[in-house]
């Protein structure tokens, strides 16, 4: 039996909302409790820094071990938009293994074959192969009958359906949010209500079927209002957002900055403020990186031709910590958003420092200043935060008690 004592640590406990100066005890890769280090234990001196659950990044589009390690991410929920699509048990099983030994990968199986939005995928066999949820990928299922069957089938399996919320009839060819910025730049745009229309339909179907629904990114005031109302009615819905939609508005695409071309697109300032309020009041359950790195060949193109997406894994922690420094949320609440809540969406018994949980741990310095540089990121440097001053760095990282950073 191997016992490790993490001493001189400030423990961030998302369950219970506490910060404690205690010693954390780990035995054979599992948290056993808090207390004095037993004789013969391996001692890790944390130097007074913060020790928290490793980040569970829900909604990642590419397995990127170096970027995840640098960002304090121990587990990822891998989106089904892979090549090949995660709609086959063999493909799902291989995807679950490719992060070893440094990263837990939890595949999100495709809800429909080839993510085409027509025929249901073989969800049950994908679950047996390791899928932890099912998803619609980068797009919305337009056929309400298909989405109803997806939710009903997933509900029978106890799975969460992870949905992209943009009405394709309005947003299909859009690259920006309708408004002053898009008009000035002459960009094809869609009204922000495209999100609310998609959310409203999916919420009604989730309520009808009793299934668990996670809207991966909600970015508009009207969308948050719908989520709040549904939660009050008892609908089993959760929602997420990325730091980009919390810290940037559509002004960031001025001068046709393709690194700020995202999906869903950046919104106007009023929607950004609504997003910050939704994080503060508990409407938002998850903050994820939306990690979707692209090389210059995909981004250094005319805005309408550039790929949507950004490299986000390495900057997730410092950008999320800005919410704590701005006193919008507490540090324990932040790690509920980054670890325990996304774990719960995926049906994982992790993301906390409670006894019996896997010792997925991150030691970090919340005050360490650095400058985001696309050229220096571990993954492709397509970040809209290039040149942005931030604070917060992962110092050491453990996966089931084994150090990986």
Task: List where the protein language model places each region.
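Histidine/acidic residue-rich metal-binding segments in metalloenzymes
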Residues: 118-287
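His/Asp/Glu-enriched, well-ordered alpha-helical/loop segment
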Residues: 184-212, 280-281, 286-287, 292-367
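Active-site beta->alpha loop and helix N-cap motifs at the rims of alpha/beta catalytic domains
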Residues: 109-116
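Divalent metal-coordination and catalytic microenvironments
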Residues: 9, 24, 29, 48, ...
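Metal-associated gating/positioning segment near the N- to mid-region
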Residues: 45-99
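C-terminal cap of metal-dependent C-N hydrolases
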Residues: 357-405
